[in-house]
Amino acid sequence: MEGRRLYPIGIQTFSKLREGNYVYVDKTELVYRMTHGASGYIFLSRPRRFWKSLLTSTLHSYFEGRKELFEGLAIEHLEKEWTRYPVLHFDMSTAKHMDKDRLLSELERKLYGYEQIYGRDESAIYTNQRLESLIKRAYAQTGQKVVVLIDEYDAPLLDVVHEEKELPKLRDVMRNFYSPLKACDPYLRFVFLTGITKFSQLSIFSELNNIKNISMLPEYASLCGITEEEMREQMGEDIGRLADNLGVTPEGALGALKSNYDGYHFTWPSPDIYNPFSLLNALADSKLNSYWFGSGTPTYLIEMLNKYHVKPQQIGARKFLAESFDAPTERMVDITPLLYQSGYITIKDYSSLTNLYTLDIPNKEVRMGLMKSLLPNYLHQYTADGLTPVALLFEAIAGERMDDALRLLQTFLSTIPQCDNTDYEGHYQSLLYTIFSLLGMYVDVEVRTPKGRVDMVMRTPTTLYVVELKLNKTADIALEQINLRNYPERFALCGLPIVKVGINFDSGRHTLGDWVIEGSMSC
């Protein structure tokens, strides 16, 4: 371990990172640009564990004029004055899982901490009055305009985003708290708010109509996260260690990191952005694992997936206008805005002709994590042990033994209690989609052809499978439909051998009844 670099895993305080000689990916040129733009009110949305808190802490140190922390960084040569401003930094992550009264108490506690520094106007009773008084007193006592930093502004609301009764109550508390910011404009140097989701300006910042949302601006695409160039420049030695552990070349290790943790884009065009939490953990441990997803899938996400009756295949590649996903979550009519803003889907392409963005799951880690979370919707009493048969399935399919794979699947499904209402074909289509996605395969459903829709298309690095499903019929009927409608013709230019698979499910036994596989045809 001697000589290994220190990665700031879980460290969100800029001063601790710099003083502890941890690896820091320099974002300070963007920090300088952001703090010297036309707008002094900035909002940034990024998924959890994407260094939003570290960015907020960086701003805190910068506005406190702590030049010594920025030695060797880009901003050292850009900033000439290093003025010390009074900073009010509110971390709202401590206000999760609270009702209205506890939330008010938590806000009062935060205000009290700064009132110990700048004093309190006893006539200011409510949280909005106390915040306004704090800003004015800090300005009067220091002679400098005040910086307000609000990290995870939406944390008090995320747990109740699906609760129609509780959300308005907590939203009103937060709206009241933020309300003085516009009136205090003469006393403010900079206001920065960051969080995961985008709540409507009217609902939270009804008085603050001059916030600039930089979440989808190309110049800030890499403000949070790590680009491939940054990774190659600063982490090459540890990529080599990972390669040794995996038994591959450094380029092979880079490919594995890319497929597992890369693929985020928050605008278009944009460099590929790696999930910083997963990437740094993988390099620190010299192994691949489900770090980001394993660190905690929010309860609210699973509850919203169920509320909107989201099927696994609905999370794949789809096209949207920006206002359909970069939209306030409390007004959403489907789950797309929440999935996008939470980092479970991301931008993959954009058409300037139609203004449509293609959104898809960013990488293998997120895809497998999502499917693990959704599998219990189809299988009762599902546990992590259930992944062992899935791993055996992967081994069979990787060896091009589809017959063995389906036999394993038949046994697996027959031994696990199923959910209710399984007597329709779509249930089994969703179940297969989820399981085969867990294997890391490319899976698509209801694929259009000139003569109808294919139930499912699966692709491995070596083979393309055209699959037709039937319920309480026969596999021969399914295969006959594939041949009659000549579905494989649609994929003639795929460059892979095509295998036709007819599968019949037996709803009485809750598993595969029979199947038939027709050998590969080269395309």
Please give the residue ranges for each predicted region.
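Phosphate-binding site recognition
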Residues: 1-424, 439
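Active-site metal-binding core of divalent-cation-utilizing nuclease and nuclease-like domains
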Residues: 138-142, 435-461
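Structural motif
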Residues: 147, 463-465, 499
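Mg2+/Mn2+-dependent nuclease catalytic core
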Residues: 167-172, 471-488
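Metal-dependent nuclease catalytic cores in nucleic-acid-processing enzymes
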Residues: 177-184, 337-345, 433-437, 481-501
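Conserved catalytic cores of phosphodiester-cleaving nucleases, focusing on short active-site segments
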Residues: 432, 456-471, 485
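Domain-level recognition of nuclease-like catalytic cores that cleave nucleotide substrates
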Residues: 490, 496-523
